[in-house]
Amino acid sequence: VVQPRCVIAPAVGQRGNTVPSSTLDIHQLESLRDVYRDLHANPELSFAEHRTAGVVAAWLRDHGFEVIENVGRTGVVGVLANGIGAVVALRADMDALPVAEDTGLPYASTVRAASAGEYVPVMHACGHDMHVACLLGACAELVGAREEWSGTVVAIFQPAEELAQGAQAMVDDGLYDRVPRPDVVLGQHVAPLPAGTVGIRAGDFWAASDSLRVVLYGAGGHGSRPETTVDPVVMAAAFVMRLQTIVSRQVAAADTAVVTIGSLNAGTKANIIPDSAELMMNVRSVDPEVRSRVLAAITRIARAEAAAAGAPREPEITLFESAPTLTNDPAAMARTLPALASVVGPERVIDPGPIPSSEDVPILATSIGVPLVFWLLGGADPVVYAGARTVEEMQAVVGRIPSNHSPLYAPVISPTLELGISTLVTAARVWLG
């Protein structure tokens, strides 16, 4: 959940003049709204974004982009060369989540798909469908205004952000050997802030994310004779409780860290003590030193609890997903910020402070040593925020409305779509000649 901390100018919780002018006509905008509804109704899981990639590739070709498909498995890249000038990368992610939608929208997803050996519901619960629609609209607008700028636009439609693997997959697949090297990477993420609001800050912005699998090994046996066993369930329970002390006792109050145990699985029957217990957990952090300290503490505690229980072998600890801290380049942000403010108005640009959400988009910039500028795009109906004029009042609203990853979450289409197009276009035009 995004918690606004600092308002660069007083936030306005009302509609106001939040739909910017655009070179796209009413028919093009309605077409993009249809694209959004279609993507929302047809979500696809990470690295399975085949239909979405097809929609993207067809749109880009129809608008004169050179298109490269299957980059990093299901990624799509569009290149629009328009004379001499800077190369600007604009990025959107495409994947959805294994969530059963409960929005009640007429275009709500009823999709189910295979995932890890089972069929699961699928939903665009994080707004990636809006990201795709906004970037497609930005591409169309940049084509329509190509006589007003020069340079090259690289539109990156990335798979598998939810696994924190898609950006690296595209880089490893030779993304930057196949397109012009960008001078800057720009992107946005929809959030439950009022539509017409942009959230951004220089420096560390989004937390790093690390997901781990820990297997604790015991010695199974009959539930009536626990003295003949080493019970991994009790071991896991002690491990979970001890993990709660990492943030409260080993991380300074001024630092940011979160340790969450998302699943604990052990056993098959009530009267059987199993041989092992598996835990899945996620760590969020901002400072690299804090990140290292928390990960080291998890390993130390797992081994110590196993030793205390008399486990027959050491635990197995696997890091299977990892995303770096998202850091906005201060100079690049200072250059881009006035453009964003020109779209929504300076009074609607807020500093939300460091947030514990994570993104793998930094890899697209750090892998080639170029700056990143990334912002939050408000997607909640501004009416919900009517009368909220202080940070505290905005926080109260954020806390009671659906947020990303909720089965109830969906951004309001307008003015979110129009503003998302304009923020991308206006930010890109700052860098293009």
Label each region the model flagged.
Residues P20-H124, D129, A133-G137, E141-S150:
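Acidic/His- and Gly-rich active-site-bordering loop/insert found
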Residues L39, G78, L90, H128, ...:
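Divalent metal-coordination and catalytic microenvironments
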Residues V77, L97-V99, P106-M123, D129-M130, ...:
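Histidine/acidic-residue-rich, glycine-tolerant segments that coordinate divalent metal ions
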Residues V234-G433:
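Metal-dependent amide/peptide-bond hydrolase catalytic core
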